[in-house]
Amino acid sequence: MASIVTCSQQGSQLNIAIAGRFDFSILQDFRNAYTLDINAPIDSVLIDLTSSEHMDSSGMGLLLTLKKELQLDAGCVELVNCRPHIRDALLAARLDHFF
């Protein structure tokens, strides 16, 4: 399955959905989601992982890069609908306090 990144903006919240693998292969599409066509300043980001089947360390790095580039505080990036193995990987990497 090819990975697909979709995004929408509701006021100051950016919504990004990842389908497929969340890894280095989506780097450009993921960066475009939060750098192109932004209509207003972003205060929070919601990342929906309902259709994401895998996340590796490069996917985790992409999340940290998003947070840094948008200069968001802790809790301003929310991951929703994580599969258990993705949640476990984030916990093992001690990234749970970032998202």
Map each language-model feature to its residues.
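Short beta-strand/loop segment at the start of cytosolic alpha/beta domains
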Residues: 1-17
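Amphipathic alpha-helical interaction surfaces in cytosolic regulatory modules
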Residues: 21-99
